[in-house]
Amino acid sequence: MNPVVVVHGGGASNISKDRKERVRQGILRAATVGYNILKQGGSAVDAVEGAVTVLEDDPDFNAGCGSVLNENGEVEMDASIMNGKDLSAGAVSAVRCIANPIKLARLVMDKTPHCFLTDQGAARFAAANGIPTIPGQQLVTERSRKRLEKEKLEKDAQKPDCQKNLGTVGAVALDCQGNLAYATSTGGIVNKMPGRVGDTPCVGSGGYADNDIGAVSTTGHGESILKVNLARLALFHVEQGKSLEEAANASLGHMKSKVKGVGGIIMVNKAGEWAVKWTSTSMPWAAAKDGKLHSGIDFGDTSIIDLS
């Protein structure tokens, strides 16, 4: 089985010119890390965790050290991961003072009988398992501060925009043994209420993986994704015989027509076919397969380079 990894850097209304190349390079790094793990015999779960960790460590993405701020100016993060081999899953929400929530979600999957831990329970579990904590302000970037200030001003001016605040990062993978996995991580939406949880940590919404069907990671307006169970909906369409592209388009179209939500999907199936689709203005993505690295940000913007 030829391994495949696909990553995304979140749906976006726009990416400024000064950030676009940094975002592209970040996505390429994440896909390359995930692909190298697979080529060295690592599992799909290892690959998606590794790829998402790269993006959590990159301040240009809304996850980990680049997370947006809640209305109190604090970082609260969500993440989830799933193994398509046995449907085991791990998720965390509203976690603070941790650089890599996806690593904590992996531990929930591997070391507890549960699927989901939140807030103080997640924090105590992290401490008990040696996950290092960092000062909360160390996760706050100047860009995040400015975004919060701008959002508060626009909220006061009553200028809602369903395309804003869509950032999430995610990965899906197929390993050499034919196993599938997904991982998704986010800082949520700018100026959210403390304790708000979106789609990202919710299995079936923020992602899903089943060796018999495929793996999905989603991005977009979290409340909209939750209402339609976007990830599992996409795989339902695959089960009904649709191609990955048809399934992604149908699911995103349903979300847009039912709740006016926009977002994006990355998918890979058990045959190693992959797809990326979005209805937001842009979505940074990269896919590695057969020694080739495909990537793009905007509609019609696709490049392919050799991995050597």
Curated annotation (Swiss-Prot):
It is an enzyme of class 3 (hydrolase). CDD domains: ASRGL1_like. The modification N-acetylmethionine is found at residue 1. Its EC number is 3.4.19.5, 3.5.1.1. GO terms for cellular component: cytoplasm; photoreceptor inner segment. It catalyses: L-asparagine + H2O = L-aspartate + NH4(+); Cleavage of a beta-linked Asp residue from the N-terminus of a polypeptide. Substrate binds at residues 196-199, 219-222. Cleaved into an alpha and beta chain by autocatalysis; this activates the enzyme. The N-terminal residue of the beta subunit is responsible for the nucleophile hydrolase activity. One of its GO terms (biological process) is proteolysis. The keyword Protease applies. PANTHER family: ISOASPARTYL PEPTIDASE_L-ASPARAGINASE, L-ASPARAGINASE. Heterodimer of an alpha and beta chain produced by autocleavage. This heterodimer may then dimerize in turn, giving rise to a heterotetramer. This is Isoaspartyl peptidase/L-asparaginase. It comes from Bos taurus. The lineage of its organism: Eukaryota, Metazoa, Chordata, Craniata, Vertebrata.
